[in-house]
Amino acid sequence: MMAHMGDGYRIESATPADAAAVAAIYAHHVRHGTASFEIEPPSEAEMAERMAKVLGAGKLWLVARDPSGRVLGYAYASQFRDRPAYRYACENSIYIHHDRRGEGIGRALLALLIVAAERHGFRQMIGVIAGAEPASERLHKACGFVEAGRMRSVGRKAGGWLDTLYMQRALGQGDDTAPDEESA
């Protein structure tokens, strides 16, 4: 994917060398928030494995970097579920460095991820928003997602019960047409 320049940052494809920075950003969210239902953050090695799985499957992982190359946030899309019938649906994940939230980095990452997912042939993108994350819900709404469902009290973290909100957005032609391989 080509680089995209933002105000004080650029967005480009992630590489395995980004695993340490990605792990650090994610660890903060695991320890101090409810955006992830993980209780203990993964190690740098585990994050490198997760990234390799997504990148190795030819899927999408983007990072936003400041001019010095520091990772400010990341977003990725992978197949929504493993079963073959889900092959046209992807799930996005977005995490921004806690010091850089509210600057539009998440919106820029998600907008580019949507374009890349459309080019990849996905027809639906799902945002799975865990816990109490109104900023993530606003971000997804701003990028054209609508609420598709809510599972109540399915997680427990930080002494409370947490919901999971599913938000969905059609990509490209969505479900208006069959994929090319089926229409031949």
Protein language model regions, located:
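Conserved GNAT acetyl-CoA-binding A-motif
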Residues: 117-129
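Acidic/histidine-enriched, glycine/proline-rich intrinsically disordered or flexible terminal extensions
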Residues: 173-184
